[in-house]
């Protein structure tokens, strides 16, 4: 799909899921490109499933690290809503079925360590829970 308007974007979205967008800050701070610092094998878990019938524009979103709330926001606070993001991205590249768009992260980003338990909760979706290795 190419050049989709925000009004038409919903027709091209299969569904929504949680993600943990992990970065290696040592690499990120020493290189000008983010690709390598976000590309290790376990760095972007998704899931645990895709919800196909949900309005993405006003959902609470939280991250817990070892049971402590670290991030707390709402999708209504996104700078650009999901439909606008799909439209914008489709003006620059062809999008194919199965492509995934991550919308960003709320404030509260911090260091993680091996053994930490991370839990993403987005209203209406199953929680995404992982242990850092």
Locate the predicted segments by residue.
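Catalytic-pocket segment enriched in acidic/His residues
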Residues: 17, 25-133
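N-terminal accessory regions of nucleic-acid-interacting proteins
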Residues: 3-14
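Short helix-loop capping/hinge motifs at secondary-structure junctions, enriched
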Residues: 1-5, 54-56
């Amino acid at each position: 799909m190419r050049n989709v308007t925000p009004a038409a974007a919903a027709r091209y979205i299969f569904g929504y899921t949680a993600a943990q967008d992990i970065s290696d800050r040592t690499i990120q701070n020493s290189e000008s490109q983010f690709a390598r610092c976000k590309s290790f094998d376990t760095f972007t878990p998704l899931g645990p499933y895709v919800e196909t019938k949900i309005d993405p524009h006003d959902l609470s979103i939280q991250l817990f690290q070892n049971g402590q709330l670290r991030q707390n926001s709402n999708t209504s606070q996104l700078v650009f809503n999901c439909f606008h993001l799909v439209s914008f991205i489709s003006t620059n590249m062809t999008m194919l079925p199965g492509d995934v768009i991550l919308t960003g992260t709320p404030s509260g980003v911090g260091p993680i360590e091996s053994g930490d338990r991370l839990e993403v909760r987005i209203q209406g979706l199953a929680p995404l829970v992982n242990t850092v290795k």
